[in-house]
């Protein structure tokens, strides 16, 4: 069995990976996301960010044998504009106000790197999420919980903001931050059967 390393500090990703893998390591990536400029293709961009994270972590590993590094990045897009993590409460409020009553996309890029062979596979998942119409009071109360501040698009579907979601089309786990079905098929492609 290969050693699996998750290149992420995200507790949500760690919790999700524990659902399908009993044994893995966590090494936080120090990849500078601003080193990859966004042009106009969100799926390519998110896969390149995931690869950057995986490669960044691979450089920290002394024992090159038998290690696979999983890099992942999740972005929220609305009207082909990327909504990252909010800078402050005002930014979070404005993001949620824009998403209110509208459909947006959540993209996750995945990259799995075999350190020894330098083989890498990349893919992405896109899930469409439709929010109900939200009142200013609902948004303000949610923003004041602090929950949106560390999340792309200023919300976490698995928390209090789950009530904002009218429907989703695609992978729920993608919206949380780690598309398990896609990850499983990619791990199988790299010789790991769960």
Swiss-Prot record:
Residue ranges crossing the lipid bilayer per the database entry: none
Keywords assigned by UniProt, alphabetized: Cytoplasm, Hydrolase, Nucleotide metabolism
EC number: 3.6.1.9
Example GO biological process: nucleotide metabolic process
Site (Important for substrate specificity): 12, 74, 158
Alphabetized SUPFAM superfamilies for the sequence: ITPase-like
Cofactor section: a divalent metal cation
Chief site of localization: cytoplasm
Catalytic activity: dTTP + H2O = dTMP + diphosphate + H(+); UTP + H2O = UMP + diphosphate + H(+)
InterPro entries (alphabetical): ITPase-like_fam, Maf-like
Active site: 73 (proton acceptor)
Cell compartment(s), UniProt: Cytoplasm
PANTHER family named in the record: BIFUNCTIONAL DTTP/UTP PYROPHOSPHATASE/METHYLTRANSFERASE PROTEIN-RELATED, BIFUNCTIONAL DTTP_UTP PYROPHOSPHATASE_METHYLTRANSFERASE PROTEIN-RELATED
Family listed: Belongs to the Maf family. YhdE subfamily.
Function as written in the Swiss-Prot or TrEMBL entry: Nucleoside triphosphate pyrophosphatase that hydrolyzes dTTP and UTP. May have a dual role in cell division arrest and in preventing the incorporation of modified nucleotides into cellular nucleic acids.
Official protein name in the record: dTTP/UTP pyrophosphatase
